Amino acid sequence: MLDNQNIFYKKKILIYGLGKSGLSAFKFLKKDNEITTHDDKIKDDNKKIIKKKFDFIIISPGIDINKCNLSKYLKDNNKKIYTDLDIFYNSYKRNNKITITGTNGKSTTAKILYDVLRDQKVDVRLVGNIGNPVLLEKKITNKTVFVIEASSYQLEYSKLFKSNISIILNISPDHLERHKTISRYVSAKFKLIKNQSKEDLAILNTKNFYIRREIKLKNFLPKIIKIEKNTNNNILKKINNPYFNTDGNRDNLKFVLEVAKIMNLKKNFLFKTLKKFKGLKYRQEIIFQSKNLTIINDSKATTFSSSMSLLKSLTNVYWIVGGQAKKGDILLLSKKSCKNFKAYIFGNNKNFFINKLKKIMKYESFLDLNSLIKRLFLEIKLEKKTKHRTILFSPSAASFDSFKNFEQRGKYFNYLIKKYINV
């Protein structure tokens, strides 16, 4: 239900960036405000925009104020910059919000929480970086609960947004091409906690170095709930879902169980939901399984850290890796921990991955994914080994060197696999 005290009312507003977020802000605000739009991809008269006086500038997550066309103008007017999350919070202050951020596992954790609440008959909406943009939801009442996935790009310029329950799953170096330093990246993530009040809760993975250091260095108002212990084996037995066998998915599960405890959810419905959860497409997705071979499509893995939980839990692995390497990415994998691994490296940046992996495991390199898959299945055919093998497509890199996004990359991998096996 809309809040009456809306500061974004009868104002002059510039919406910068016309992607999903910007367009949703335009639709939400146009009725009661004087709106001007700008997108760097569309030819506009920048001088006219600069001369106008705006009360607010709503910036889309994809806009980097250090690189965009109106960079100086935005920096000079930084105090006026807000986000769609700010508009959303200002409009729906009364509604309960659970917001998830972190380097890895945001979408999966948000989807599990959404499924859990939906199955408990809660009027719940899945929004943000997953699902609808936050401003497109309709038929909202005071009882509506929002599960929000928030990226560092969304949080970076937010000034008002806060959540009743905030979750930071983990932090490892990522998006440094935008944030420049790990310190700035951490600060963007902790915007989620910074705006909270004493009545709010922050659930944090304090085993994580960057999270642990941040809460030692700074004082935050919300009650901090530390996630440190492993998930109880009895609970895992009750859930009985192989999806939660990897370290990463068990870590995500711990946060879900903590929220369920806080919200006093019914355990029988909770375990029933968790038992049937199958995961999201292209995220540790098992696309084929037989007696001797498992094929996993983990195209969403865009850093080494996002591949680690699977790599640590597997043996006898054909690891397909490659793409646009990310600035500051660190591989924390030893030769000892790689039991019978072989890397199949593809793409224009293959030398980066060769240098990272050559002392840890055997490898072959290929110009593209097509020639790699062809060679891999020939090798499997010639092998006489009876051990169970896993083909792991977990690129540990961004997809933009060859693909539009990780979804297109994941879809292409499935297409190639279907040439050799019935997926």
Residue ranges and their predicted role:
Residues K11-K12, L23-D32, N46-F54, P61-A202, ...:
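Phosphate-binding loop of NTP-binding sites
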Residues D32-D44:
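NAD(P)-binding Rossmann-fold cofactor-contacting core
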Residues K43-N46, D64-N69, N208-E214, N232-N233, ...:
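Short, charged/polar "capping" segments at the starts of alpha-helices
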Residues N6, K41-K53, D368:
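Short acidic low-complexity segments
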Residues I330-H388:
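C-terminal helical cap/extension that packs against the catalytic core
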Residues T36-D39, A202-T206, I320-V321, N340-N348:
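Short internal beta-strands
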Residues D3-K12, L23-F28, D123, P242-N340:
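Nucleotide phosphate-binding/pyrophosphate-handling subdomain across enzymes
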Residues L18-G19:
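Glycine-rich Rossmann-fold phosphate-binding loop(s) that bind the pyrophosphate
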